[in-house]
């Protein structure tokens, strides 16, 4: 699996461990309550002569729930817990160094089914090692 996909899966595992109203998946929001993430425009912040690099992954987090408070609590918890961690997961050739908030969770709309939708974005800084 690629470094980017491994790092995203590791972040998803951290979110799932929070015990929110839903586990998180990749892709688009479905018809029911849920949380999803996907990588947005991203790239290396620094590249070294040995080709190790710092990647900045812009990770979009979207959520949907019939109860706005439940959704807001989940989205804010994701940001608070991920950005306040002191230890992040890593793999054989990569290590998450830091996670910061790019865009705070914000309400972006309501579906005809009365489900609220919120969106946010995280910067996931990953050090890759060849």
Where are these regions (language model features)?
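Active-site-adjacent structural patch at catalytic or cofactor/ligand-binding sites
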Residues: 55-64
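Small/polar-rich, solvent-exposed N-terminal microdomains that initiate assembly or binding
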Residues: 1-51, 73, 85-95
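Mid-chain, well-packed structural core segment of small domains
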Residues: 66-88
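Short, charged interaction patches at domain edges and termini
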Residues: 1-13, 42-54, 94-130
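Beta-hairpin (beta-strand-turn-beta-strand) motif
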Residues: 42, 64-66
């Amino acid at each position: 699996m690629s470094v980017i996909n491994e790092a995203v899966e590791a972040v998803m595992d951290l979110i799932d461990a929070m015990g929110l109203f839903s586990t998180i998946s990749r892709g688009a929001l479905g018809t029911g309550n849920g949380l999803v993430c996907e990588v947005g425009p991203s790239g290396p912040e620094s590249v070294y002569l040995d080709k190790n690099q710092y990647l900045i992954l812009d990770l979009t987090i979207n959520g949907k729930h019939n109860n706005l408070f439940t959704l807001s609590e989940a989205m804010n918890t994701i940001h608070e817990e991920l950005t306040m961690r002191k230890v992040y997961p890593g793999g054989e050739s990569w290590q998450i160094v830091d996670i910061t908030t790019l865009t705070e969770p914000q309400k972006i709309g309501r579906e005809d089914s009365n489900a609220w939708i919120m969106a946010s974005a995280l910067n996931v800084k990953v050090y890759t090692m060849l």
